[in-house]
Amino acid sequence: MKSNLHGLYLVTPDWDDTRKLLEITELALKGGVSLLQYRHKTADAALRQEQAECLQALCRSYEVPFIINDHIDLCLGINADGIHVGGTDKSVAEVRAIIGPDKILGSSCYGDLALAHAAEAAGASYVAFGGFYPSKVKKYPVTTAPTIVSDWKAQGKVPSCVIGGMTRDNSAPLVANGADMVAAISSVYLAGDPQAAARAFVSLFAK
C-alpha cells in the first residue's frame, strides 16, 4: 500500500448511487489518485457501510490509501487506512488516541496556521487548508489566503492539502507555493472524462 501524502486527494460526492460512485471512482483511480476520502454527509449508516466497504476494496486493488471522513467507528470497523476530522469533530489528540499511531490522520485547519501547528503537535499526518475558491459541494466562506501554503511549507513538518473549489488551473499556483496535495470533488466526479481530469491534477506534481 502506498502512503505517499502527495498528489491528488480525491473526495467523494454525496451520491446514493453506489454503482455510479464506484464506476467514476475507478476511472479517477486509473488517472493517478494518491488518496481517496469517503465523505457522504447525508447517507444513513447502512449506505455508508456499503459504500465504504466497496470503495475500500477498489482502493486496495489500486494500492491507494482509503480515508474515512469523520466516522471513527466506520474507520475502525472496516480497518480503513485513515480518517479525516474537521472543526466540529473530536480533537486531533482524541482521535489519534483512539485510532492508534499507524493510521493516517488528517485535520481541517481552514485558514488558521495556529490550528495547523496544534494539529501537527497532536499527531496529525497532514493538515488541510481552505476554502480558497467557491465550492459547488462544500458551503463554506472563501477566507483562506494563498500565502498560508508557503507559510506552512516554511514552518510545518507534516504535508499540507488545499481544498475548496479546486480545478487544475486554480490549484496550480497553490502547488507551486508548496501544497503537497490538492483535494478535489466535482472537478473530477462531474468531469466528462474523470480519468483525464484526475491525470490533469496529477500533472501538477510531476517533476
Swiss-Prot record:
2-[(2R,5Z)-2-carboxy-4-methylthiazol-5(2H)-ylidene]ethyl phosphate binds at G165, I185, S186. SUPFAM superfamilies: Thiamin phosphate synthase. GO terms for molecular function: magnesium ion binding; thiamine-phosphate diphosphorylase activity. It catalyses: 2-[(2R,5Z)-2-carboxy-4-methylthiazol-5(2H)-ylidene]ethyl phosphate + 4-amino-2-methyl-5-(diphosphooxymethyl)pyrimidine + 2 H(+) = thiamine phosphate + CO2 + diphosphate; 2-(2-carboxy-4-methylthiazol-5-yl)ethyl phosphate + 4-amino-2-methyl-5-(diphosphooxymethyl)pyrimidine + 2 H(+) = thiamine phosphate + CO2 + diphosphate; 4-methyl-5-(2-phosphooxyethyl)-thiazole + 4-amino-2-methyl-5-(diphosphooxymethyl)pyrimidine + H(+) = thiamine phosphate + diphosphate. It is an enzyme of class 2 (transferase). 4-amino-2-methyl-5-(diphosphooxymethyl)pyrimidine binds at Q37, Y38, R39, H40, K41, N69, S108, K138. GO terms for cellular component: cytoplasm. Its cofactor is Mg(2+). Keywords: Magnesium, Metal-binding, Thiamine biosynthesis, Transferase. Transmembrane segments: none annotated. Condenses 4-methyl-5-(beta-hydroxyethyl)thiazole monophosphate (THZ-P) and 2-methyl-4-amino-5-hydroxymethyl pyrimidine pyrophosphate (HMP-PP) to form thiamine monophosphate (TMP). This is Thiamine-phosphate synthase.
